[in-house]
């Protein structure tokens, strides 16, 4: 059966295998690599929704394929693909280089095919995207499943009119941009993501192509999955492009819409049929209220699966709530991101709680049986000086000391990089928060991403730190934290030495690249590629530390196949 739509996910930089780029510690605290190969969960939702409407949809993670196989020819692969419509996600801004380069290749070999962009960044930069001749349509918003179906009906079945599809921006036959009303903002999302994980398993079997559906390079070794609870957010974190303010201004969503507790558990059960790996329930369950959180946790307790859970807090929690987490998800992992040790900085960025409240929550989480407790801090915040960022590392030492070296406690810090999110309060109101936005256009961000050093991809400075200070402070703070991990035996001496070697080599390389860039010596920069690539591919201690030890049998292919056959 022919394919109607192929959804492509690009690497952050299309030709990352050829360019000399020192990526820095920009992806150390997330599952994907510096190529940001993870595709948004919206692709699986769209594929499943369109599948129920009778369309044949395929997902291809080009980024993973390019990472896993140095000889993989992305252009030749795209040339062989056949479909009347291609879709490319530009959700996270870090994909703005790769996504557009992939678009050019698609149109080069499939000039008659229609090309659609979608995602948060596509929504924000929709006007600039349609200036590229390769892009025919942009679907705006956080819930484009139904508009996408209507667009497929128009293009494939010649039913309906483009002018009547909500959220669509498109080019007419004369090349003029037409902007339809941005009005499809569903307040009920229980008709999407009904069986999207099951649909992925079915598609893998159908296309005999597991690698194209894997979200990250090492997923087969560490099969972590995610479950979302809502679209939108209740919080207003200054640095986040997914804040309540950003959703109102950029995505037309006045308030978040939540999936039913039953839908959340349905996802968990779908995942448990094919994977024994950890499940990350994204977002603070209390966003929809304490009753909603209790319902989800009660259902998790009643529908027990063997997978380990990673849960998230946006702000401190009561011991009773943490105990409920422990009963529902034994040996759960917990994450919280205060971002700074300084309560005044936390208040400015949207974390208005005291250090005493934070510390009480950490104590209580350990007391009720939390298996691992991850605390995240950040560099590049309003009112944060280099000294303040270093003092945050000292505060990490204080937290480790007061936990008496409990090895369940892990501290992390990283720079706000590569971008301050377009749409975030800091990006939209920089003067208020002390940010200096260095580039605003989509094309400026694209060029910056391809710079030889991560310093030059930063789209901001602050009243308190230059880009150079952000780079230097980041390396110094991470090195200090690395030493604390050794002191409290959180990581091994060997891993710490590897981490220090990587960080110091990267810091020194950033200085060498600065010097060569000041001389405009591009040939010398190109000669450094083997050394830069070696630094980029060093083991990352933080990624290793963040992994939940998976069981020996990580995936359940026969159980997944049986589930597809029987529907159980």
PLM regions: where:
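A structural motif corresponding to the C-terminal lobe/cap of the Radical SAM core domain
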Residues: 3-11, 82-83, 102, 258-259, ...
């Amino acid at each position: 059966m022919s394919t109607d739509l192929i959804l492509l996910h690009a690497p952050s930089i299309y030709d990352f295998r050829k360019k000399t780029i020192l990526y820095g510690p920009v992806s150390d605290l997330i599952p994907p690599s510096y190529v940001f190969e993870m595709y948004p969960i919206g692709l699986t939702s769209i594929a499943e929704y369109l599948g129920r409407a009778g369309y044949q949809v395929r997902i291809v993670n080009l980024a993973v394929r390019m990472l896993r196989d140095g000889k993989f020819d992305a252009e030749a692969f795209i040339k062989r693909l056949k479909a009347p419509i291609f879709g490319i996600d530009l959700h996270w801004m870090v994909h703005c280089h790769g996504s557009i380069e992939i678009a050019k290749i698609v149109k080069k070999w499939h000039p008659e095919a229609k090309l659609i962009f979608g995602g948060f960044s596509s929504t924000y930069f929709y006007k600039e995207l349609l200036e590229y001749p390769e892009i025919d349509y942009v679907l705006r918003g956080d819930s484009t499943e139904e508009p996408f179906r209507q667009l497929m009906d128009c293009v494939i079945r010649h039913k309906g009119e483009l002018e009547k599809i909500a959220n669509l921006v498109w080019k007419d036959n004369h090349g003029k941009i037409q902007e339809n009303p941005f009005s499809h903002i569903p307040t009920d999302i229980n008709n999407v993501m009904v069986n999207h994980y099951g649909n992925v398993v079915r598609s893998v079997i159908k296309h005999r192509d597991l690698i194209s559906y894997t979200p990250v390079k090492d997923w087969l070794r560490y099969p972590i999955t995610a479950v979302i609870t809502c679209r939108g957010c209740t919080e207003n974190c200054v640095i986040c492009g997914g804040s309540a303010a950003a959703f109102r201004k950029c995505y037309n969503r006045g308030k978040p819409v939540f999936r039913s507790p039953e839908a959340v558990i349905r996802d968990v059960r779908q995942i448990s049929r094919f994977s024994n790996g950890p499940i990350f329930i994204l977002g603070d369950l209390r966003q929809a209220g304490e009753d909603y959180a209790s319902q989800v946790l009660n259902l998790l307790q009643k529908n027990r699966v063997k997978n380990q859970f990673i849960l998230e807090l946006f702000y401190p929690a009561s011991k009773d709530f943490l105990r409920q987490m422990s009963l529902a998800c034994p040996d759960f992992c917990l994450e919280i991101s205060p971002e700074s040790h300084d309560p005044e900085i936390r208040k400015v960025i949207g974390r208005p709680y005291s250090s005493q409240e934070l510390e009480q929550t950490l104590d209580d989480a350990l007391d009720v049986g939390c298996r691992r407790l991850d605390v995240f801090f950040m560099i590049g915040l309003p009112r944060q000086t280099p000294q303040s960022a270093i003092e945050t590392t000292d505060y990490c030492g204080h937290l480790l000391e007061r936990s008496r070296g409990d090895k369940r406690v892990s501290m992390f810090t990283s720079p706000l990089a590569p971008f301050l999110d377009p749409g975030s309060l800091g990006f939209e109101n920089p003067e208020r928060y002390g940010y200096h936005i260095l580039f605003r256009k989509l094309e400026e961000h694209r060029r910056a991403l391809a710079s030889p050093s991560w310093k030059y991809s930063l789209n901001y400075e602050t009243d308190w730190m230059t880009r150079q200070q952000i780079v230097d402070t980041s390396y110094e703070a991470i090195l200090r934290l690395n030493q604390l991990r050794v002191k409290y035996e959180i990581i091994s001496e060997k891993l710490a030495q590897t981490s220090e070697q990587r960080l110091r080599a990267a810091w020194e390389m950033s200085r060498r690249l600065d010097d060569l860039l000041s001389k405009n010596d591009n040939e010398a920069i190109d000669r450094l590629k083997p050394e830069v690539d070696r630094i980029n591919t060093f083991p990352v201690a933080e990624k290793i530390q963040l992994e939940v030890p998976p069981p020996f049998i990580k995936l359940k292919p026969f159980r997944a196949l049986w589930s597809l056959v029987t529907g159980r």
